[in-house]
Swiss-Prot record:
Protein name: Tetraspanin-17
Topology in the lipid bilayer: Multi-pass membrane protein
Keyword set, alphabetical order: Cell membrane, Disulfide bond, Glycoprotein, Membrane, Transmembrane, Transmembrane helix
GO MF entry, a single one: enzyme binding
Location of the protein in the cell: Cell membrane
SUPFAM superfamilies associated with the record: Tetraspanin (SSF48652)
Gene: Tspan17
Family: Belongs to the tetraspanin (TM4SF) family.
Subunit annotation: Interacts with ADAM10; the interaction influences ADAM10 substrate specificity, endocytosis and turnover.
Record-linked InterPro entries: Tetraspanin/Peripherin, Tetraspanin_animals, Tetraspanin_CS, Tetraspanin_EC2_sf
Positions of disulphide bridges: C155-C223, C156-C188, C172-C182, C189-C202
Length: 270
């Protein structure tokens, strides 16, 4: 009987995983660069790039920070994953998987802490919103963000309309010369569907009235409570999005680690 010869196949890099990782990360890289460009453009329009100290002058949150930070992280991750997969660079692939793993565990830790320390998170959210209420007129992007949140969640202030007493333009002190004294922003007003033109003065002097008289004109519930209610009403959707993001991160880590193993196996066979 003729002898049987066992054939050994040389290890090779899996093309499917390699190009899937490359394609996914090039999209991620482009989106990150776009976010970063929008953030830098917004800062340029506000003159922040020519005066870096302006970054710390704002008392509240500058929404542009979200674009810059998220865009920067996405760009770095996308670059490492894209170039690492294309050039079969194990250093970049390991950096990608470790960085992505770190982000995943930070998200997981944040989720657990938010569940365990719900009351503390609620207090911090209340403090955060009130700090931004104080800085409402200081930055147009922050102003637009607050207006959007109050209109979307049908709320006013962190715990109620009286939180606007923290703002120098809306407080009720006798020394306040502003026409907006004892008022609230227009985004607190209950919109009349029949109105074609937005009445930006609808909140003037509204807090001089009794609370029962305010109810038909402005939202009297705070944004912290309304946000919690929104989370409860949309818990399945929010949980689904978070799980999908987590699965994508785990998939990215596994693909990168598998590609590193293939590359090292090929190198060891040289």
């Amino acid at each position: 009987m003729p002898g049987k010869h066992q054939q050994f196949q040389d290890p090779e890099v899996g093309c499917c995983g390699k190009y899937f990782l490359f394609g996914f990360n090039i999209v991620f890289w482009v989106l990150g660069a776009l976010f970063l460009a929008i953030g830098l453009w917004a800062w340029g329009e506000k003159g922040v790039l020519s005066n870096i100290s302006g970054l710390t002058d704002l008392g509240g949150l500058d929404p542009v920070w979200l674009f810059v930070v998220i865009g920067g992280i996405m760009s770095v991750l996308g670059f490492a994953g894209c170039i690492g997969a294309l050039r079969e660079n194990t250093f970049l692939l390991k950096f990608f998987s470790v960085f992505l793993g770190l982000i995943f565990f930070l998200e997981l830790a944040a989720g657990i802490l938010a569940f365990v320390f719900k009351d503390w998170i609620r207090d911090q959210l209340n403090l955060f919103i009130n700090n931004n209420v104080k800085a409402y007129r200081d930055d147009i992007d922050l102003q637009n963000l607050i207006d959007f949140a109050q209109e979307y969640w049908s709320c006013c202030g962190a715990r109620g309309p009286n939180d606007w007493n923290l703002n120098i333009y809306f407080n009720c002190t006798d020394l306040n010369p502003s026409r907006e004294r004892c008022g609230v922003p227009f985004s607190c007003c209950v919109r009349d569907p029949a109105e074609d033109v937005l009445n930006t003065q609808c909140g003037y002097d509204i807090r001089l009235k009794l609370e029962l008289e305010q109810q038909g004109s402005i939202y009297t519930k705070g944004c912290v409570g309304q946000f919690e209610k929104w989370l409860q009403d949309n818990l399945i959707v929010v949980a689904g999005v978070l799980v999908a993001i987590a699965l994508l991160q785990i998939c990215g880590i596994c693909l990168a680690q598998n590609l590193v193993s293939d590359i090292e196996a090929v190198k060891a066979n040289w």
